[in-house]
C-alpha cells in the first residue's frame, strides 16, 4: 500500500528480517528468506527489481531487466559497451571514482560501473542513485528511457549507514550517508515512481540523518504469531519428505503451535526437523527448552532468563494475609485475558522482607512462562535499542507470560532532563509497552524493589504497575510466631512452650524474614556441630533452649535499621490496597507516615 499509493518512496524494513516466509507460486509452495520472498512476490510486469548486498554485486531479479537498464544507461551516458577484459586492473578502473557527470568521462560504460561497484559500497549506492535519475530521464523525442518502475533493495543498511555522530564516522561512512540523504531527499525522486527499501534488523542502528527524515517510513516485520506457526507446522508435516515419516507429537499441532510462541519459523523448523530425525516423540519439555534457548540466544543470557521456581505459595512462611490476597485477588487477574486482566504490579518493602521469595512462589503457582528481565542496558553503542526491539517483538508473539524484574529501581531509570538520552528512551519505551492495549492480558509485569520511591512516577501510574502496589512488611503477630516456629523446627525436639515462644519473640523483636532465615541457618550449623562432637549414639544434635538462646544472643543485626524503617514507610505510603496495610487505615495515619519519612530525610536517611 505504501508503494502503490506513493505514501513513501523510502522504506526501512526492520524486525524479523532473518526469518523464513511462505510463498506460493502456481502449484509450488515454500518457505524462503526475506529478500527472495520480496523479489518473487513483486516480480510483476512494470517493475524492475534490483538487490544490493554489502559483500556482493548489484543484482537484477531478471537478466532481461539488467539488459534494459544497461542499454538505457549507455544511451543516457552516450557510451557503448567495449570488449570487457576481466583481467584488467580493477584499481585502474576504480580510479575513475564516483558517478559525477560533470567530472566523469562520458564514455564509461554500464558494465564497468557494475564491476567497479563490487566491494565498493559507496560507488554502489551512487550507481543505484544514478539508476533512479536514469529512470526519470527521457530521450530527444521526450520518451522515457525506462518505462518500468524501479524497486531497489539495500541489505545490511545498518552497516552501510551506521548510526553515530557524523564527526566520529569514517570518511566513507559520511560519504555514503550524504549520497543517500541527497538521493531520498530529492523532490523529483519523492514525486516519481521508484522506491528504495533499506533492510536492517533495527532501524535504530541506521544513521539518524537518514532514519529521521520525514519521508522515510519504517515497517516492522513481526515475529510469527499463532496462525503463522500453525501453518508452518501443517505445511512441514505435509511435505514429501515428511509424508512417510510424520511428526511424532505428544499432542495436537495446535497445542504445539501454542507452546512454540516466541520462536521464529527458522527456530521452529530446526526443532521439528530434529524431532523428525530422532524419531522420538516431541514432548512439551523439549519445546519449552527450545523456546528458552532461542529467546536467550536472541536477547542474551545476561538480559533474560526463563525461570521455573522450585517453590510455590504453600512454601511461604507467615504473610498469611498477603498469601490469601495473592490467591484470591491477584492470580485470577494475572491469568485472565479479559478486561479484568492486570497490566502489572509493583512489590515493595524493606530489604530482607522476603519479597523475591514470596513472588517467586507466586510465579511457581502460575502455569505460565516466567521471564526474568536481568539487564536490558548494553555497554555497546546502539545495542540497548536493538535489545529492546527484540524484546518487544518477542512479547508481541507470546501468548501469556509473567515478566519478573527484581531490583527494578536499578533496571529502569528516570525520564527527566538530567537522565542520559539512552536511559530516557529505554524507560519511555518500557512504559509505553506496559500500557500497550495489545499486550494487556498476555503480558503481566512484576516489578520488585525495596526503593519504590526511585521508580519513575510514569512507571508507577495506574494502567502500568501502579494499578497494584503490594507491600511486603516485616512479620508481626501470628506471622512472627509462624516464622519463629519455622526457625526452630529443625533444631528442637517436641513442642515449644508458650513461655519459650514469648522469650524468643522478645529476643528477635527486630527480625525480618531474612533475619529469621539467617538465624535458622546458624541454629542448624550449631546443631550439626553438636552432633559431630557427640560421643554417644543417643545424642541427636538437637539443641536445648539455653543453647538456642546462646546462639540468638550472640547475633548482632546489621546496622541498617533506619534505612529499613524508611523503606517500610515508603512501602506503606505507596501501597494501593487498604486491605494489605497493617491495622486500621486513616488519612491521619498516612500523614504520620509522611512526617516520619520527612524526619528521617532530615537526618540523611533516604534508603
Label each residue range with its predicted role.
Residues 1, 6, 607:
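N-terminal nucleic-acid engagement/recognition segments and initiation subdomains in replication
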Residues 1-3, 11, 25-240, 311-505:
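Walker A/P-loop NTP-binding motif of AAA+ ATPase domains
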Residues 7, 17-23:
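N-terminal targeting peptides and non-cytosolic leader segments immediately upstream
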Residues 40-44, 79, 131-138, 239, ...:
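Surface-exposed polar/charged interaction patches
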Residues 297-361, 365, 393, 397-398, ...:
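C-terminal engagement/docking regions of AAA+ P-loop ATPases
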Amino acid at each position: 500500500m505504501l508503494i502503490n499509493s506513493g505514501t513513501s518512496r523510502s522504506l526501512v524494513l526492520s524486525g524479523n528480517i532473518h526469518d523464513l516466509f511462505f510463498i506460493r507460486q502456481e502449484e509450488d509452495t515454500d518457505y524462503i528468506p526475506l529478500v527472495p520472498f520480496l523479489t518473487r512476490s513483486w516480480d510483476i510486469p512494470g517493475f524492475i527489481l534490483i538487490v544490493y548486498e554489502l559483500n556482493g554485486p548489484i543484482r537484477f531479479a531478471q537478466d532481461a531487466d539488467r539488459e534494459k537498464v544497461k542499454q538505457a544507461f549507455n544511451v543516457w551516458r552516450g557510451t557503448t559497451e567495449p570488449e570487457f577484459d576481466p583481467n584488467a586492473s580493477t584499481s585502474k578502473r576504480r580510479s575513475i571514482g564516483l558517478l559525477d557527470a560533470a567530472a566523469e568521462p562520458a564514455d564509461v560504460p554500464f558494465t564497468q560501473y557494475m564491476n567497479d561497484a563490487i566491494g565498493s559500497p559507496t560507488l554502489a549506492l551512487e550507481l543505484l542513485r544514478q539508476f533512479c535519475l536514469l529512470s526519470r530521464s527521457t530521450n530527444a523525442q521526450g520518451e522515457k528511457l525506462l518505462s518500468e518502475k524501479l524497486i531497489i533493495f539495500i541489505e545490511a543498511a545498518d552497516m552501510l549507514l551506521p548510526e553515530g555522530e557524523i564527526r566520529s564516522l569514517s570518511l566513507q561512512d559520511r560519504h555514503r550517508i550524504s549520497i543517500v540523504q541527497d538521493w531520498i531527499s530529492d523532490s523529483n525522486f519523492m514525486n516519481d515512481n521508484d522506491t528504495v527499501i533499506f533492510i536492517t534488523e533495527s532501524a535504530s542502528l541506521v544513521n539518524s540523518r537518514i532514519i529521521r527524515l520525514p519521508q522515510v517510513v519504517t515497517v516492522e516485520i513481526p515475529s510469527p504469531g499463532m496462525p503463522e506457526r500453525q501453518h508452518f507446522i501443517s505445511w512441514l508435516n505435509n511435505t514429501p519428505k515428511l509424508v512417510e515419516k510424520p511428526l511424532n507429537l505428544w499432542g495436537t499441532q495446535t497445542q504445539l503451535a501454542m507452546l512454540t510462541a516466541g520462536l521464529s519459523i527458522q527456530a521452529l523448523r530446526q526443532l521439528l526437523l530434529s524431532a523428525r530425525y530422532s524419531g522420538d516423540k516431541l514432548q512439551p519439555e523439549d519445546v519449552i527448552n527450545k523456546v528458552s534457548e532461542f529467546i536467550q540466544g536472541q536477547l542474551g543470557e545476561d538480559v533474560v532468563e526463563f525461570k521455573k521456581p522450585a517453590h510455590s505459595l504453600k512454601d511461604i512462611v507467615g504473610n498469611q494475609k498477603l498469601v490469601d490476597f495473592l490467591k484470591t485477588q491477584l492470580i485470577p487477574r494475572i491469568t485472565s485475558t479479559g478486561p479484568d486482566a492486570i497490566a502489572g504490579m509493583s512489590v515493595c518493602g524493606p530489604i530482607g522482607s522476603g519479597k523475591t521469595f514470596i513472588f517467586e512462589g507466586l510465579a511457581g503457582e502460575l502455569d505460565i512462562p516466567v521471564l526474568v528481565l536481568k539487564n536490558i542496558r548494553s555497554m555497546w553503542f546502539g545495542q540497548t535499542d536493538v535489545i529492546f526491539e527484540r524484546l518487544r517483538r518477542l512479547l508481541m508473539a507470546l501468548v501469556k507470560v509473567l515478566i519478573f524484574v527484581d531490583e527494578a529501581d536499578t533496571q529502569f531509570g528516570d525520564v527527566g532532563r538530567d537522565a542520559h538520552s539512552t536511559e530516557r528512551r529505554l524507560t519511555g519505551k518500557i512504559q509505553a509497552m506496559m500500557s500497550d492495549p495489545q499486550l494487556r492480558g498476555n503480558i503481566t509485569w512484576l516489578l520488585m524493589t525495596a526503593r519504590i520511591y526511585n521508580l519513575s512516577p510514569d512507571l508507577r501510574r495506574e494502567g502500568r504497575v501502579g494499578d497494584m502496589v503490594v507491600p511486603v512488611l516485616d512479620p508481626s503477630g501470628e506471622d512472627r510466631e509462624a516464622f519463629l516456629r519455622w526457625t526452630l523446627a529443625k533444631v528442637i525436639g517436641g513442642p515449644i512452650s508458650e513461655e519459650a515462644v514469648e522469650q524468643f519473640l522478645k529476643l528477635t523483636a527486630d527480625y525480618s524474614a531474612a533475619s529469621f532465615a539467617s538465624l535458622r541457618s546458624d541454629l542448624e550449623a550449631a546443631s550439626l556441630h553438636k552432633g559431630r562432637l557427640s560421643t554417644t549414639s543417643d545424642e541427636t544434635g538437637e539443641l536445648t533452649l539455653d543453647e538456642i538462646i546462646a546462639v540468638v544472643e550472640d547475633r548482632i543485626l546489621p546496622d541498617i535499621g533506619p534505612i529499613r524503617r524508611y523503606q517500610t514507610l515508603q512501602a506503606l505510603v505507596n501501597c494501593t490496597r487498604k486491605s494489605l496495610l497493617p491495622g486500621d487505615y486513616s488519612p491521619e495515619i498516612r500523614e504520620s507516615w509522611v512526617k516520619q519519612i520527612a524526619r528521617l530525610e532530615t537526618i540523611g536517611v533516604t534508603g
